[in-house]
Amino acid sequence: MDLLPKSSKEFAAPEYWEQFFRRRGERAFEWYGGYLELCGLLHKYIKPRDKVFVVGCGNSELSEQLYDAGCQNLTNIDVSEVVIRQMNERNSNRRPNMTFQVMDATQTTFDDSCFQAVLDKGTLDAIMTDTDKGTLETADKLMSEIGRVLTCGGRFLCVSLAQAHVLEKLVRHFSQGGWMVRVHQVMQGSTSETGSQFPMPVFVFVMTKVRQISGFPTVLEMMPDEEGGKPVRWGSPEEFMEAVKERQRYALIRNRLNQNQSSQEVSLDLCDGDSRKSRYTFYIVDSPAVRLSHSNHFAIFIIPHGRETEWLFGSEQGRKQLAGSVGFNRLIIVALHRDQQYTDMKAIQSELSAKVLELAPPGLPDNQQIPFLSAGEDIGSRTIQHRGKSEFSGEYVVEDVRGDGNSSYRRLIFLSNQNVVQSEARLLPISTHIGQKKRKDKKKQQKPVKDLEQPTITRIDKSYLCCEHHKAMISGLALLPNPGLLPECQASVLVIGLGGGSLSLFIHDYFPGSRVEVVEIDPSVLDVASNWFNFCQDERMKVHLADGLVHINSLADNGEACYDVIMFDVDSKDPSVGMSCPPPAFVEKMFLQNVHNILNANGVFILNLVCRDTDLRLKVLNVLHEVFPLIYAQKIDEEVNEILFCRPNSERKFSSLELKESAKNLEKKLRKPGVQWDSTYSLAEMLKSVQIV
């Protein structure tokens, strides 16, 4: 039997409700929940002595249960004569102080300020089926009538699904009238006779009528889920309504995840109740291929502090791999946020236990213990060393984190894209001990002083290149003539884009004959590299604070510069383009021609290309080919990055085998006794799949 409206128009029609109640007969239809779900809130705001006006009562048992609980001065109205007759017959003897009247809620016959409380459960929703002018006028009449009959200090309790247009009308009307507005979320949904649930949560809005005071801010509050929690106050109706919509979105996610496995990763943020800043990010990953047993339905994985940018945790593909490897049907991967304090794993588990159960998969056995997993024995470490703001990239942080194997790293992260590490360096901590020298002159000998330990000095491991594309760019130097002699040759290198300086420093330190010039547009980046990444300039290392486009065009116009190597490692600030490295202007033909003009005839132009748009990538390659006749490409494993090695002539073509052999010879020269080398870095390996394009 279909008891729910077939369309929103039926939802508001009196004829529908007449038919509806005839079909229901004596049984109560508890629209949006019954007394058990609502009683806690109702008795919080409605006192036994209050005179209560119930709008659109229907044949709900709510008024009867309120009466039996002590709130006996109840006046109920409804537009349906059928339901009012039924309710009067049912209650006239048992509940003599409660009245039921046929009346239109938009034009009642009650005196002004005669009620201390007004209760509406779904009537406003039923009226506001759309945003037509007539509908909005009817809603305004209803709310104005409620305001008229309610005494100052009285409360209007509105139980609603808070659809967007209803929410807008309700909040705007009462906040603009100077009323205090508070909202509670009651439940996930109301269970129907078939066992299905509403996909949207139910809210109780509590509007308190107060005397308007000029200049007094409107009070807009959302109550937390847990008992005893402090209300969250919002500064504007827009913020308040967005908070309600966030609850609705979360409820829809819960509903979907509780009933089905998700074929796609679902992510959401949990915010701190006081600061409203993100405290946790959840990534919910289902692995349908996992064979279910009693104990592998559900688990939580905590990413150690500071490691959320690693591929395994920071990419969807990596998280999918992680979920498959741990062997649970559903895995919630939890990222911790900077600027939030976490005590230990036990405290995190206690904080999240209730929330993660809301996102449990279907079929989770009752009382099953949910395991909390991690990549280490503790929650990791993150120390913010410096904060700043760049004119070009916005706010940024420099932070030290402990990675896998207790290695420590320093990272530059722009907060506009927190999942991407702009620069990273491996740290080498050292300490210096200052002891007292022994004196032969006993008369002058002072009392012994304990050895003093200076504060730990942080040193950068300049052999470490964190980015795989940086390693590939260095490997591309094997394309130069006589790579075995290259480290000592006076090669001239132009690098566009500084970052933390690791790429430029590597060239400077491992190619002692080189002369490196770096062009960086952002002074803040140079400051960070110099102050926090041990970058320094000397006679072989010079930084130009300039726009790379302008600088290269100027060099080409002057016709004096000639470089053996030109490297582009510069990102785009325009997210609307399907290419994040480099900016489109850097691959225009006229500009590339200037790059060609300042490149040695036997030199190499190395471009870090990050392009997700296949058509745009093809276009870039076509333009490059118009300027550079020979181009090698090396894809970076598990990344979008592609390194292009562009030669100004095609007289000498290397096979993949020849290039790898050339890279091996170059690496032999770079691995000098007494010079630190990253054992994980193989130049030849970085060119394993290079090909001419």
Swiss-Prot record:
Enzymatic reactions: L-lysyl-[protein] + S-adenosyl-L-methionine = N(6)-methyl-L-lysyl-[protein] + S-adenosyl-L-homocysteine + H(+); N(6)-methyl-L-lysyl-[protein] + S-adenosyl-L-methionine = N(6),N(6)-dimethyl-L-lysyl-[protein] + S-adenosyl-L-homocysteine + H(+); N-terminal glycyl-L-lysyl-L-glutamyl-[protein] + 3 S-adenosyl-L-methionine = N-terminal N,N,N-trimethyl-glycyl-L-lysyl-L-glutamyl-[protein] + 3 S-adenosyl-L-homocysteine + 3 H(+)
InterPro entries: Lys/N-term_MeTrsfase_sf, Methyltranfer_dom, SAM-dependent_MTases_sf
Keywords carried by this UniProt record: Methyltransferase, Multifunctional enzyme, Transferase
Entry keyword Metal-binding: no
EC number: 2.1.1.-
Alphabetical GO biological process terms: methylation
Pfam families: Methyltransf_31, Spermine_synth
Function as written in the Swiss-Prot or TrEMBL entry: Dual methyltransferase that catalyzes methylation of elongation factor 1-alpha (eef1a1 and eef1a2) at two different positions, and is therefore involved in the regulation of mRNA translation. Via its C-terminus, methylates the N-terminus of eef1a1 and eef1a2. Via its N-terminus dimethylates lysine residues of eef1a1 and eef1a2.
NCBIfam families: MFS_SpdSyn
The name this protein goes by in its record: eEF1A lysine and N-terminal methyltransferase
Upper classification of the organism: Eukaryota, Metazoa, Chordata, Craniata, Vertebrata
